[in-house]
Design a protein with these regions (language model features):
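Conserved SAM/SAH cofactor-binding pocket of Class I
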Residues: 98-207
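Short loop/edge segments at beta-strand edges and connector loops
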Residues: 76, 176-177, 252, 274
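Mobile active-site "lid"/loop adjacent to the S-adenosyl-L-methionine
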Residues: 199-229
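Non-catalytic accessory regions of SAM-dependent methyltransferases
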Residues: 1-43, 51
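Residue-level signal for inorganic ion chemistry
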Residues: 31, 69, 99, 133, ...
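Conserved Class I SAM-dependent methyltransferase catalytic core
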Residues: 225-285
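Conserved AdoMet
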Residues: 30-109
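Conserved hydrophobic residues forming the short capping helix/wall of the S-adenosyl-L-methionine
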Residues: 14, 110, 163, 238, ...
């Protein structure tokens, strides 16, 4: 079977699933390249290349995994985030474009502050998962030192490997902690606290795409009946841990604008930023 034939067959298999139809061609091509260890250019250059039996078997196995709604990122073990390649496993939430907007918002706030200050920025990433936020901020803010916390030891292992991959281990420290609970009081003076916490109401579980509902870590998604269990703990902790005028940056869910604004009443400069679908997605506020 040639590359072209294998790709056509896999695309048809994936397209037969209503949950996978929209991205069937893209996913088939990604899986083919991953199975063969070839680039996109190599795939296009020789579509009539014949697959060996071992290559065909490897490709078929990946397609079968995808047909169970296993996310493409878990199959390939990779996801790009803010221009950086990250390792991902089922232990971590797959980084999403909405969280790139959170990073962009923090960078916009901090770059001027960094220029105006001779001191390094101290940043805390709460619920770091793959390390995406911590790594992107450290990469783009060369004078920043980041503490990244997570309750999951498996997630922290993934995050640490990603920091090493991007040569950032000297400026990112990973700590096992339930929110800020494990951080000593003398460390609680951050310039920025950023977080993409769990915020999906448990009642919304059935409405999630099967690949999210069935494969991504529930602890990184769900936050009680209304989705605010983590926010209610995190926001007071963040206020105590920020320096005066320090920045809190949170990703929020659809329909959570008013409740988040209420939880952040008493903070300064509250702003809610919309995503590309005009849904409020990022909350920014300054400690009084």
């Amino acid at each position: 079977m040639t590359l072209r034939e294998a790709l056509t067959r896999a695309t048809r298999q994936l397209a037969a699933s209503p949950d996978l139809r929209a991205d069937a061609a893209r996913d088939a091509a990604l899986l083919l390249r991953h199975a063969l260890g070839i680039s996109h250019a190599a795939q296009l250059a020789d579509p009539e290349r014949t697959l060996t039996p071992a290559q065909q078997a490897a490709f078929d196995a990946l397609v079968q995994r995808r047909l169970t709604n296993d996310p493409i990122q878990y199959i390939t073990g990779e996801q790009e985030f803010y221009g950086l390649a990250l390792r991902v496993t089922p232990a971590v939430l797959i980084p999403r474009p909405e969280t790139e907007q959170l990073v962009e918002a923090v960078l916009n706030e901090m770059k001027q502050a960094e220029l105006d200050s001779k001191q390094s920025l101290r940043i805390l990433d709460v619920g770091t998962g793959s390390g995406a936020i911590a790594i992107a901020l450290a990469h783009h803010l060369p004078h920043a030192h980041v503490t990244a916390v997570d309750l999951s030891a498996a997630a922290l292992e993934v995050a640490a490997s990603n920091a090493a991959r991007h040569a950032l281990t000297d400026r990112i420290r990973f700590v096992a902690s339930d929110l800020l609970d494990a951080l000593p009081p003398d460390e609680l003076h951050f310039d920025v606290i950023a977080s993409n916490p769990p915020y999906v109401p448990t009642a919304d579980r059935a409405s999630l795409h099967p690949q999210v509902r069935e494969h991504e870590p529930a602890a990184a998604l769900f936050a009680g009946p209304d989705g605010f269990d983590v926010y209610r703990r995190l926001i007071p902790q963040a206020r105590a841990a920020l320096r005066p005028n320090g920045l809190l940056a949170l990703e929020i869910g659809q329909g959570q604008r008013e409740a988040i604004a209420s939880l952040l009443s008493g903070w300064n400069e509250l702003r809610l930023l919309d995503d590309l679908q005009q849904i409020p997605r990022i909350a920014l506020a300054r400690k009084p």
